[in-house]
A protein has these predicted regions:
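Flexible, compositionally biased loop and terminal segments
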Residues: 1-176
C-alpha cells in the first residue's frame, strides 16, 4: 500500500505556473524557460501515464483523488491557519502569492486531469469544501473498489513447512 501526495504531479502543476523551477532540475536541453515548450509538457504527461501504467500492469490498484475546494473555502482555511495557533505551522506567506494565481492553477489542474486520466488510473474529482463529506466520498470509493477483491488472503504454507512448525519452534527455543 502506498500513497503519493502530489509527487509526480508537481511536475505538471507548480512547474507550469512557475516554469523557472524547472531550471533547477538541470535537464538536458533546458537552459532557459524559453526551452520549455508544449512538447515538453506533453512528454511529462506521457511519462506520468507510462509510470502509472507500469504500476497498474504490475498489480497496483491506482486511486487518484483531486480534492477540489472553492477559492472562498481556501480563503477560509488560510484564515483558520492564521487564527488557530495549532494550525499556524501550515501557513506560509507564499500562500498569499500563490492564491493570486488561482485561475492559472485551475487551468493547470484541468489540463493535468484530462491528460492523465486513463482506464487503469482514473481521476476522482471530490468536492471538498466540506472536509467530512469529502472524506466520506473518498472512503466510499475505496470501499466500493476494494470490496471487489474478495479473494485476498494470506498465502498458504507449503505442507512440508506446516508439518514441521513444531520442529522449527524447538530449534528457535534452543537459541540457534
Amino acid at each position: 500500500f502506498g500513497v503519493f501526495n502530489r509527487t509526480h504531479y508537481e511536475n505538471v502543476l507548480v512547474t507550469r505556473v512557475h516554469p523557472e523551477y524547472i531550471l533547477g532540475e538541470y535537464l538536458p536541453d533546458i537552459t532557459s524557460t524559453e526551452d520549455i515548450d508544449d512538447a515538453f509538457w506533453e512528454r511529462r504527461f506521457r511519462q506520468i501515464n507510462d509510470f502509472e501504467r507500469h504500476l497498474a500492469e504490475t498489480g497496483t490498484q491506482i486511486f487518484k483523488f483531486f480534492m477540489h475546494i472553492s477559492k472562498e473555502e481556501q480563503r477560509q482555511r488560510l484564515l483558520r491557519r492564521l487564527r488557530l495557533p495549532r494550525k499556524n505551522w501550515k501557513f506560509s506567506p507564499a500562500d498569499l502569492d500563490e492564491r493570486e494565481l488561482w485561475d492559472t492553477y485551475q487551468e493547470c489542474y484541468q489540463d493535468a486531469i484530462q491528460k492523465t486520466t486513463t482506464d487503469h488510473a482514473p481521476w476522482y474529482i471530490i468536492p471538498s469544501d466540506n472536509k467530512e463529506g469529502a472524506r466520506l466520498i473518498v472512503a466510499s470509493i475505496l470501499l466500493q473498489v476494494l470490496e471487489g477483491f474478495r479473494d485476498i488472503r494470506e498465502p498458504e504454507l507449503e505442507p512440508e513447512v506446516k508439518a514441521n512448525l513444531n520442529k522449527y519452534i524447538k530449534e528457535l527455543k534452543k537459541g540457534k
